[in-house]
Curated annotation (Swiss-Prot):
Keyword Transmembrane helix included in the entry's annotation: yes
Keyword Transmembrane: yes
Region (Disordered): 1-21
One Pfam family it belongs to: CASP_dom
Name the UniProt record assigns to this protein: Casparian strip membrane protein 2
Subunit structure as annotated in this protein's UniProt entry: Homodimer and heterodimers.
PANTHER family in UniProt: CASP-LIKE PROTEIN (PTHR36488:SF12), CASP-LIKE PROTEIN 1U1 (PTHR36488)
Record field: transmembrane: 26-46, 74-94, 109-129, 164-184
Organism taxonomic ancestry: Eukaryota, Viridiplantae, Streptophyta, Embryophyta, Tracheophyta
Residues exposed to the Cytoplasmic side: 1-25, 95-108, 185-189
Amino acid sequence: MKVSTIESGEISKGASSPRKGMKRGLSIMDFILRIFAAMSTLGSALSMGTAKQTMPFATRFVRFKVSFHDLPTFLFFVTANSIVCGYLALSLVLSFFHIVRTISVKSRILLVFLDTVMFGLLTSGASAAAAIVYVAHYGNPSANWFPFCQQYNSFCGRISGSLVGSFIAVVIFMILILMSGISISKSKH
């Protein structure tokens, strides 16, 4: 029966196994969260992009209708959510690569950098749209902007719902960035 001893400077193979298992778990969670964020941004873009309503009455020359493309802020919101959804779909490949190969660090650094850029884009689009939705619901009496959600309640319901999905994706991005930072820091030690 042979007894093997570990000399100083050697690392046993069993010591890296828990760390590798934790990194694999983080990578699997990263993959799942990216899928949820992609679905959330896609739902938000579709909900806002199809939001329109026509008033049931019309005058002889004027027909009262509202659509998302009437406001440039909503166009930016749809564009930002679409770009982020496309990025998330493409980043699933890299996220799956991290499940298979847990020791890759450079690709994780690239992913955390791009995640941060997309987080900023998504946050700016969602925040700008939230400001317009607030004015649509409550108006601004000092600027003489009247709320119009009482007349266009279906439209306002859709745009408010699309904000929920977008802000869920913002929270998921915060979690993804933190998890990537943890994964990168664990690989340096």
